[in-house]
């Protein structure tokens, strides 16, 4: 989206959206032509099997208090990313950056940093363990968010913004990997799909 908004400064405003639509068509066509896997067990699940039992299993494994704490962690662990996301572009514009700068430079930096962070997040979990990685990710995101205050009090500086965006996206990439591993560790094999869906909805 940021890239398309950047192109909007150079080309007609509607052209980037045509480009986005064309790219989305590739995925849609691939989805339509991909054969569906065969499922030999086509039995309709009851409400108890589909919803109540997975919740009961989760509470039983962790007890009510621990389950409540875990759900609170799940609900708030990526809260800053979720809140910051929609505010990013308006913030950059208010700070004096053009749509071209946001789309062609900042968003590219963010993409590269996120990919590196996702990769290193897996290495961090392997070396430090899941729970230490959770703490590291939380502090990294907290610090990277605070860095945006420097942008708010400074003159428009694309190099400074790129460094801070890189740091923020890198931290978010690590947190993304760690968060997925954390959620995976909470679900049981019997109710994997339902419990994972419920946890990611928080």
Model-inferred region functions:
Residues 99-100, 189-199:
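Loop-to-transmembrane helix entry/capping segments in MFS-fold secondary transporters
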Residues 22-40:
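C-terminal membrane-cytosol helix-exit motif in multi-pass small-molecule transporters
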Residues 139-156:
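C-terminal ends and interior cores of transmembrane alpha-helices
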Residues 86-103:
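Short amphipathic helix-loop junctions that connect adjacent transmembrane helices
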Residues 1-11:
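Single conserved hydrophobic/aromatic residue that forms the stacking wall/gate
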Residues 39-69:
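Juxtamembrane intracellular "pre-TM" segments in multi-pass secondary transporters
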Residues 174-188:
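Intracellular juxtamembrane helix-capping segments at the cytosolic ends
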Residues 116-131:
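Helix-to-loop junctions at the C-terminal end of transmembrane segments
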């Amino acid at each position: 989206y940021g890239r398309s908004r950047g192109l909007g400064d150079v080309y007609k405003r509607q052209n980037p959206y045509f480009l986005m639509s064309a790219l989305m068509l590739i995925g849609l066509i691939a989805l339509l032509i991909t054969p569906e896997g065969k499922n030999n067990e086509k039995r309709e699940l009851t409400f108890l099997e589909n919803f109540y039992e997975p919740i009961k299993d989760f509470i039983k494994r962790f007890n009510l208090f621990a389950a409540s704490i875990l759900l609170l962690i799940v609900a708030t662990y990526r809260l800053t990313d979720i809140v910051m996301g929609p505010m990013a572009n308006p913030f950059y514009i208010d700070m004096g950056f053009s749509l071209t700068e946001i789309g062609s430079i900042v968003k590219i930096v963010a993409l590269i940093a996120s990919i590196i962070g996702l990769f290193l997040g897996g290495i961090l979990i392997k070396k430090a363990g899941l729970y230490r990685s959770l703490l590291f990710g939380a502090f990294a995101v907290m610090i990277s968010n605070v860095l945006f205050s420097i942008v708010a009090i400074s003159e428009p500086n694309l190099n400074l913004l790129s460094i801070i965006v890189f740091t923020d996206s890198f931290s978010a990439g690590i947190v993304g990997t760690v968060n997925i591993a954390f959620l995976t560790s909470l679900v049981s094999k019997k109710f994997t799909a339902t419990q994972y869906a419920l946890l990611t909805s928080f």
